[in-house]
Amino acid sequence: SLRRQRQMCIRDRYFVLPYTIGDYLADDIRTGPIPTDLPEFEQAEELVIDKIKNLLENQGSKTVDHYHKILGKIIWNKCGMSRNEKELKEAIVEIQELRADFYKNVFVPGTNESFNEPLAKALRVADFLELGELFAKDALERTESCGGHFREESQTSEGEAMRDDKNFTFVSAWEHTGIPSNAKLHKEQLSYK
C-alpha cells in the first residue's frame, strides 16, 4: 500500500520530501500505474542487477560503514557550510578515489535471495558517493555566498556573506550522464516580481 511505502521511506531515512511538495504532486500520484516495459526501465534494471552482483561477489575487506564515515568527514570538512574552491576541488578528487576504492575493497556479506540489510546499505552508500561528488561539484560551480552556505571567496570586507544575484539567480538541475564528474548543468532562471 502507499501508506506502507511512505512509512518504509520515512523509516529508511533515504528520502527527504518537503511538506509542500506533497500537495504539488498530489494529482500525479493518482495517475495510476506507470508502465515499466520501456527500454529505459530494462536498462536501469540491468545496471542495478550488475551492481548488486558485483558488490556481493567482491572479496574486499572493508565495511560499508568504513566508507560511509570517510565520505561524511570529506563532506563535513570540505563541503560544509563554509566552503572554498581549493577544498571543494580536493573533496571531488577524494570522493572519486573513495568511490573507486569502495568498488574494489568493500565487503558485503549475504546473498540477494532475501532482504539483505548490508547490501541495502552498500547500495545506499554507493548512491551517496555519487551524490557527494555531485554535491561538491555543484558547490564549486556556485561561487557566491547564499542562504546558509558561505563561500569564502565571496564575502564583504567585513566578512559578511556576499550574494551574486546577477550571475546566480537560477535553480540548478544536474543531468546524470553516467558519472558525477560528467554531469550536465541545466539552469532554470528565476524572476522575482
Segments from the language model and where they lie:
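Glycine- and aromatic-enriched mobile tails/lids
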Residues: R4-Q7, R11-K193
